[in-house]
Amino acid sequence: MTLFDRSWYNRGVVEKVFDFCTDAQRHKFFDQVGPFENMLEQEGVHLIKFWLNVGRAEHLSRFMERERNPLKYWKLSWIDVEDLNRWDAYSEAIDETLSKTNLDHSPWHVVRADDKRRARLAVMQTILSQFDYAGRN
């Protein structure tokens, strides 16, 4: 099992919000997602996509904790701080990215992630529901 955190979907969200890519590059990305994901699945990859959705207040709370905690400070970057100032642009980019890359053969599973424990359980439950295994029922 391989987990990708953020991965190439950044092209649709972060790169759009911060002008790290052109509109043409972003639209090309959207055009390539379906064929690429389809190719992966034809090669035996079982692709399960999750969007862990964190609300604005929780987002701020986590950033403040990272700022105060020397063991978590390394997780905080200038882009993270700027995120809150661009919340509306992020929301639009996320909605568009999820809409354009939510495909029949590889749908998104949007998980409310303000509560980390519940979010992790929801992700595990979804992953396990995708496979047959001894003792499943």
Predicted regions and their residues:
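A glycine- and Lys/Arg-enriched "phosphate-lid" helix/loop adjacent to the NTP-binding pocket
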Residues: V14-Q32, L40-E92
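Arginine/glycine-rich "motif VI" loop of SF2 helicases in the C-terminal RecA-like domain
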Residues: M39-E43, K100-L103
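NTP-dependent small-molecule kinase module
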Residues: Y90-N137
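Long, contiguous hydrophobic alpha-helical segments, chiefly transmembrane helices and signal peptides
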Residues: G12-V13, V111
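Conserved phosphate-interacting/catalytic interface
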Residues: L3
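Residues immediately flanking
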Residues: R6, L52-V54, A113
